Amino acid sequence: MKKYFILACCLFGALTMSAQTWEPLFNGKNLNGWKKLNGKAVYKVENNAIVGYTKANTPNTFLVTKKSYGDFILELEFKVDDSMNSGIQFRSESKKEYQKGRVHGYQYEIDPSDRAWSGGIYDEARRGWLYPMTKNPKAQTAFKKGEWNKVRIECLGNSIRTWLNGIPCANIWDDTTPSGFIALQVHEIYNKADAGKCVAWRDIRICTTDVAKYVTPEAQLAPEANMIANTLSPTEKKEGWALLWDGKTAEGWRGARMADFPKKGWAIEDGILKVNKGDGGESTNGGDIVTKRMYKNFILSVDFKITEGANSGIKYFVNPDLNKGAGSAIGCEFQILDDEKHPDAKMGVKGNRQVASLYDLIPAPKDKPFNKKEWNTATIVVKGNHVEHWLNGVKVIEYTRNNAMWNALVAYSKYRDWPNFGNAEEGHILLQDHGDEVWFKNVKIKELK
């Protein structure tokens, strides 16, 4: 009997030692350990919860922890008025030298609207949306209106992950802020009639011990977004991604009509591959650039940003030797364009020369998610003859080439005179010089079998 008693004690001790350690951030009675920043919204303790009330004529208000946290697992529950917007800051800061102390940093979005982006990650007062829920639409049904919702946030090194009611929502790889405070946001209101509405938080607890031991396995995560420019995260490397541009040199690229990289018309500055401003002509400045090798089946991802009135493009299945005359090298094109200011947007047929379209062949929808003042992500998927265009995580075009319908489509386009256009088994990838300033970064490719 004594032997079994000792064994039981040992097992209990082992279980106790291995149990996850949680620390409450809110004692259910008062706001000890917290302080208010920026706005004048009111926070109260009611029924063992922190309740924030909206107030007119005041900016976003934050109830922040007096301590900072780096690697942690945070869990809590929230309940929010259906007409409000709110959030949970983490790894956030307030510095006098930054916008006069404005709270900034990562925010777990609380969004009860029909947009349904709860669980997404917003960079408050800094970069804006890092992980809108268009990147993971399966999680948009996780939020429960009028009920308590359970949040989980995991931060370990550069890995940041979120859950809502047990459903994985966001997953980013980022190194902007390694530590900071946690805060509960009461969003500013724009209509005085919305004053007095509330959002509540309860059961707020954090684990900061042996975090790596308790984070969720990779198989149970949302799709990852790498926010560190021109790098590959461990997950991307594991999945077979490669940098098509290294962010520093012209390695792997050349001019479409020359053996080397153009000596003018292009610049590499601060991790950005830039087409310099020219006369607006097609390949009349530095000329297009192409990959030195060809690609067959792949997923290509490119971040791009345009200046006002700009025109450019990303081409694939390119044969640089096909066009011996003036103009750009020939290939299928993911159009990059300022639809509002560039005249090419009104040419072609039914908008097939507008941004994200398969240039002069298939139009992207008018309601595509594009912001010409921000960075946008173009994704091109090629699997044999099946091709897709994606813009900012939303599929905007898909088509099949090498068939009668495709050939008929080409016959009514500007490519009609190029034999077998778009039907090549493989080709180069091209970034276009159209004489307008356009920026590229995060040029990545995953080759498919």
Residue map of PLM features:
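Carbohydrate-interacting regions of secretory-pathway proteins
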Residues: 20-449
